Amino acid sequence: MSSYALPSMQPTPTSSIPLRQMSQPTTSAPSNSASSTPYSPQQVPLTHNSYPLSTPSSFQHGQTRLPPINCLAEPFNRPQPWHSNSAAPASSSPTSATLSTAAHPVHTNAAQVAGSSSSYVYSVPPTNSTTSQASAKHSAVPHRSSQFQSTTLTPSTTDSSSTDVSSSDSVSTSASSSNASNTVSVTSPASSSATPLPNQPSQQQFLVSKNDAFTTFVHSVHNTPMQQSMYVPQQQTSHSSGASYQNESANPPVQSPMQYSYSQGQPFSYPQHKNQSFSASPIDPSMSYVYRAPESFSSINANVPYGRNEYLRRVTSLVPNQPEYTGPYTRNPELRTSHKLAERKRRKEIKELFDDLKDALPLDKSTKSSKWGLLTRAIQYIEQLKSEQVALEAYVKSLEENMQSNKEVTKGT
């Protein structure tokens, strides 16, 4: 199982962070020798820079206590190669935090979730002989700092019988020893000095993230690495306005081949890239002709819809191209005068012809009609005359037949 930790943790130098501020003095845990218990926490007085996680009333005897917000929770079944007394632990996490208090119900549930013989044991100074024998295997890890000593959260690979004994007693011992120490020591694996790192979180960040301790502990234990990607660290989300603008401008969104930018004057169906077709797009080639854009457009027909523009393009392609003039066409005054005289003569002749047509039609001469009205009346009159001519020809033919019959009768008599 791969190791993972809380998503928003940053490496911090060795510092003393009190867990709570006691209203009344409590009895300290029985002290042991330095050789048997190297985890005896150092007494650090409470100062104005303390970060109380809860009220003093919630830390009475018989009540459960939650782990601090800035602790690491590694997987239960992770194998550790440094269980000897001489080798120092090689921390794979970027940050190593120490824990002084732990809740017994939370530890019991966490051991059930692990589902194997190796569980997550809190190694604390033992108080009786039974606890010291059970947890003697976990007291060989050397100190991480020469100035501050604290109880370290270390995994255990003992059998199931010794795990149950050490876990139940060590949690109760941790509760009693935390009443005397009231501190949590955070140690950086890179350096044990007190020099602050450049990315060290401020005190306000600890105050903001210290309230939801139980939720953070449960998420760090039960979340998988895939689920932890949803929890974005605070430093990635709290950008300033200028930094976010630079980040967005440096990484522009990638547009797909199907996305086109449209200009303000063009209709929606026209892409800005007129010569680009959808043949190179990852769609079905058999359907590409339906969405293919026209190859070329003229500036005059740019705002015409696709169907009408296609029709105009086909029609105008049949018209031969007119040769362009080398210069503007100019006429001399004589040509202008002759053109005006010819235009006046033509209009006069047309007016006279329409007047003759109006006289030929059986219309009232006093009514004023337009040229369109005169032509319409003339067409109707011509059709009427044709029908009358056909009727007259039929009548004349019938009269001729009657005359022939009358002649034959007169000859026979």
UniProtKB/Swiss-Prot annotation:
Q: According to the UniProt entry, which residue ranges have a biased composition of type Polar residues?
A: 1-22, 43-63, 127-136
State where it is primarily located. Answer: nucleus
Q: Which GO terms describe its cellular component?
A: nucleus
Q: Which SUPFAM superfamilies match?
A: HLH, helix-loop-helix DNA-binding domain (SSF47459)
Listed Low complexity bias regions: 23-42, 86-103, 116-126, 150-197
Name the job this protein performs. Involved in the sexual differentiation process. Modulate the ability of the cell to differentiate in response to the nitrogen starvation signal; in particular in response to decreases in the level of cellular cAMP.
Q: Which protein are we looking at?
A: Protein esc1
